[in-house]
UniProtKB/Swiss-Prot annotation:
GO cellular component: cell division site; microtubule cytoskeleton; septin complex; septin ring; sperm annulus; sperm flagellum
Protein name per its UniProtKB record: Septin-10
Ranges for domain Septin-type G: 40-306
Ranges in coiled-coil conformation: none
Chain intervals for the UniProt region annotation (G4 motif): 185-188
Region described as G1 motif: 50-57
Gene giving rise to this polypeptide: Septin10
UniProt KW keywords: Cell cycle, Cell division, Cell projection, Cilium, Cytoplasm, Cytoskeleton, Flagellum, GTP-binding, Nucleotide-binding, Phosphoprotein
Species lineage: Eukaryota, Metazoa, Chordata, Craniata, Vertebrata
Amino acid sequence: MASCDEVRQLKKEHTRSLTMCGHVGFESLPDQLVDRSIEQGFCFNILCVGETGIGKSTLINTLFNTNFEELESSHFCPCVRLRAQTYELQESNVRLKLTIVNTVGFGDQINKEESYQPIVDYIDNQFEAYLQEELKIKRALFNYHDSRIHVCLYFIAPTGHSLRTLDLLTMKSLDNKVNIIPLIAKADTISKSELQKFKMKLMSELVINGVQIYQFPTDDDTTAKINGAMNGHLPFAVVGSMDEIKVGNKMVKARQYPWGIVQVENENHCDFVKLREMLICTNMEDLREQTHMRHYELYRRCKLQEMGFIDIGPENKPLSLQETYEAKRHEFCGERQRKEEQMKQMFVQRVKEKEAILKEAERELQAKFEHLKRIHQEERMKLEEKRRMLEEESVAFAKKKATCELFPHQSFLASGSSIRRDKDRKKTDGASAFCDCITAQENVRLCISSQRKEMD
């Protein structure tokens, strides 16, 4: 199976070159492109990474010869945050939309372990916003404000020793997401000999730790020589200042010290001119292209691969977007059916488990009901037995009462004389018996009433 490069080479070999018989007019295409680009304008986004007070804002002001009036940052920020500001600049008839992203509070925390993470997240968020705009059905990239970072100016403190661990971690995290240009800030604070040793030490550490910084391109013959020479001067040692001081007969941007003057645009004093030449005058468009063709494409490819889109099938066969879409659609449909079947089985299983629980609860309730019913019946039988016994006692008592009421008359008819002789004694005995009968009758009535209440 031929690779894509072989296919393109084969097509190129079958392309015929012809000589035109006259003027057509497509020679004006470069002019058309220039006119359209001038009409649209350009955008350029710079990320400045460095600790607070290292001179980021001053250098940006000096690079574009403009006072952007950024707010001063505090040294007591609890976390790192990024502050983006966009400006409209115009030079001759060329308009530039410049966005400067400053890292506020970078390196000011005691725990610097995650100081680089907000920077990585910001760059990824800009890539994601552009990708979402690109994936829309109705895209508007012509009017879309591209906020992707084109270059990262990484400011290194002029310690004269080596890179800090935070600097290595940060640059290592950013080198596959943005074009990094390392800068030695405030280069006028160390001597020239120390500066050269410091440059060599920094480049050696970057190579050893595998940090990929931006290399000025040498594939274009018009800029290959100067770019190749400038690659040997990295990292640039820079000084920034908007103050103008009179040197000789002219005013120059410089910094005044008791021991002398450091001229910003003097190549013998610092590398500011080299930085401006490489960043703005020569390689600004290459930085924009590298951001789109390399870093953004890497992010886009990873995102599409996460979504399941691939260019080559299992048999190293090129796949079109439609084929990939159909394959993913078939895969998702199968996955959905499988999950639906799993959910149905899970639902049936849970229904069975719930039914078993309910049946067990029903059996327990039925057993409890039968137990209570049996107890109630036993209690009722006991009460019925007590009621029957009380009724029998009541009937016996009534008979006894009737017998007691007839007893005095029978005694009078059988023995009148004895009654008269014992008149007083019998009257007393009759009254006592009558009272006892009344008391017994009341007790029986109260007992019957109490039993009926218990039965009710």
